[in-house]
Amino acid sequence: MSTGTVVQVIGAVVDVEFPQDAVPQVYDALKITGEGSCNGLVLEVQQQLGGGVVRTIAMGTSDGLRRGLEVVNSGSPISVPVGTATLGRIMNVLGEPIDEAGAIGEEERYVIHRSAPSYEDQSNTTELLETGIKVIDLVCPFAKGGKVGLFGGAGVGKTVNMMELINNIAKAHSGLSVFAGVGERTREGNDFYYEMKDSGVLDKVAMVYGQMNEPPGNRLRVALTGLTMAEKFRDEGRDVLLFVDNIYRYTLAGTEVSALLGRMPSAVGYQPTLAEEMGVLQERITSTKTGSITSVQAVYVPADDLTDPSPATTFAHLDATVVLSRQIASLGIYPAVDPLDSTSRQLDPLVVGQEHYDVANGVQTVLQRYKELKDIIAILGMDELSDDDKMTVSRARKIERFLSQPFHVAEVFTGSPGKYVSLKDTIRGFKGILSGEFDHIPEQAFYMVGSIDEAVEKANKKK
């Protein structure tokens, strides 16, 4: 346990001098001791500058920090509580409780910097995970133990979609979940807590928050804290769900830290180590022969530009991508998932079966044709189309509306009860629309319903 002193403070970056023979290693956690508001503040070593000086990032506010304060080296990276004691609790990046419900009472702590499982230990299964959301189950099905990205600009429903997935999967799958709130709004974290409490699944969720108002160090490391807790459950042989909201803020925190450390920025001002930082996190989110981690990550898309380096780097790591479109949201169709832009490696006849594959393909073909015809309709009107094209447009409009669905977590806003639709019902409904079985039903009947039976019932009521 060597001690050093603070020699320079620049915002969240703190330089600490140690004796030459006891310099801390990179990623070691240091603790400020002594009087004042900064007592107990944790610093993480980022660089060794030579001459016994290390450059660190503060894991908390550096207000009141001054030169000359004593710093103690813990001799190991930041460690956080793991295991069942974390369930139902809200913690910060250091694993300290922030829900005013007393100590965590953990039996074990893990360090947050760990290596990814080796090739031999990783497993590759293709078991499907039913979400109960029609558009996702049909067009971009999730794999158990896979990685899913929810891509979308500001305000198109990433968090609501994620909350619905947690609600549906946590109830149906009754597994354990870890939720990492990375640089998001505190209000959303609060909503999430009460949502879980009301639906009775709070005792199955561990929550780790490093929100928007916190220093960049917290936001950069909080995803690793959540992941470490998920890894412990996986290593115990459980199937765990990891939700990260929002992975873009993780990148952004890395950009801030990189700039504070004086590194030269790369494309669009991002850190030069963007791909490596993303890889360090994503490579650890994997399933082993003992247990699985299924992860759902919300990805904010700056200015709706999917070619921005941050979302583009994230794409490479995912098995399924759910793209939320502002255009679809503006039509009032929620969830605003773009069925032509969303993809999944699982959408393969060998995995999902021939029927599912054909129906999904048919839906995409009809919607693509409708997209091409929109220009003609805008210029010449519907009357100029051939009978086949008129039928395609009619079915496409029904499919578009049938892709909408009332959510459980949005009941307060929509006023209509949420619906969980099984994969069997989803395929049956879309297959019927494609085959012309429901050509006699008006398109309004397909809007905001669960299964196809509800659409038929709605149409009969309107008669």
From Swiss-Prot:
<dbReference type="Pfam" id="PF00006">
    <property type="entry name" value="ATP-synt_ab"/>
</dbReference>
<keyword id="KW-0406">Ion transport</keyword>
<dbReference type="InterPro" id="IPR003593">
    <property type="entry name" value="AAA+_ATPase"/>
</dbReference>
<dbReference type="GO" id="GO:0046933">
    <property type="term" value="F:proton-transporting ATP synthase activity, rotational mechanism"/>
</dbReference>
<comment type="function">
    <text>Produces ATP from ADP in the presence of a proton gradient across the membrane. The catalytic sites are hosted primarily by the beta subunits.</text>
</comment>
<dbReference type="GO" id="GO:0016887">
    <property type="term" value="F:ATP hydrolysis activity"/>
</dbReference>
<dbReference type="InterPro" id="IPR036121">
    <property type="entry name" value="ATPase_F1/V1/A1_a/bsu_N_sf"/>
</dbReference>
<keyword id="KW-0375">Hydrogen ion transport</keyword>
<dbReference type="GO" id="GO:0045259">
    <property type="term" value="C:proton-transporting ATP synthase complex"/>
</dbReference>
<dbReference type="InterPro" id="IPR020003">
    <property type="entry name" value="ATPase_a/bsu_AS"/>
</dbReference>
<comment type="subunit">
    <text>F-type ATPases have 2 components, CF(1) - the catalytic core - and CF(0) - the membrane proton channel. CF(1) has five subunits: alpha(3), beta(3), gamma(1), delta(1), epsilon(1). CF(0) has three main subunits: a(1), b(2) and c(9-12). The alpha and beta chains form an alternating ring which encloses part of the gamma chain. CF(1) is attached to CF(0) by a central stalk formed by the gamma and epsilon chains, while a peripheral stalk is formed by the delta and b chains.</text>
</comment>
<keyword id="KW-0813">Transport</keyword>
<feature type="binding site">
    <location>
        <begin position="152"/>
        <end position="159"/>
    </location>
    <ligand>
        <name>ATP</name>
    </ligand>
</feature>
<dbReference type="Pfam" id="PF22919">
    <property type="entry name" value="ATP-synt_VA_C"/>
</dbReference>
<dbReference type="InterPro" id="IPR027417">
    <property type="entry name" value="P-loop_NTPase"/>
</dbReference>
<dbReference type="Pfam" id="PF02874">
    <property type="entry name" value="ATP-synt_ab_N"/>
</dbReference>
<dbReference type="InterPro" id="IPR050053">
    <property type="entry name" value="ATPase_alpha/beta_chains"/>
</dbReference>
<keyword id="KW-0472">Membrane</keyword>
<dbReference type="InterPro" id="IPR000194">
    <property type="entry name" value="ATPase_F1/V1/A1_a/bsu_nucl-bd"/>
</dbReference>
<keyword id="KW-0067">ATP-binding</keyword>
<dbReference type="InterPro" id="IPR005722">
    <property type="entry name" value="ATP_synth_F1_bsu"/>
</dbReference>
<comment type="similarity">
    <text>Belongs to the ATPase alpha/beta chains family.</text>
</comment>
<keyword id="KW-0066">ATP synthesis</keyword>
<dbReference type="GO" id="GO:0005886">
    <property type="term" value="C:plasma membrane"/>
</dbReference>
<dbReference type="InterPro" id="IPR004100">
    <property type="entry name" value="ATPase_F1/V1/A1_a/bsu_N"/>
</dbReference>
<dbReference type="InterPro" id="IPR055190">
    <property type="entry name" value="ATP-synt_VA_C"/>
</dbReference>
<dbReference type="GO" id="GO:0005524">
    <property type="term" value="F:ATP binding"/>
</dbReference>
<keyword id="KW-1278">Translocase</keyword>
<keyword id="KW-0547">Nucleotide-binding</keyword>
<keyword id="KW-0139">CF(1)</keyword>
<keyword id="KW-1003">Cell membrane</keyword>
<keyword id="KW-0997">Cell inner membrane</keyword>
<protein>
    <recommendedName>
        <fullName>ATP synthase subunit beta</fullName>
        <ecNumber>7.1.2.2</ecNumber>
    </recommendedName>
</protein>
<dbReference type="InterPro" id="IPR024034">
    <property type="entry name" value="ATPase_F1/V1_b/a_C"/>
</dbReference>
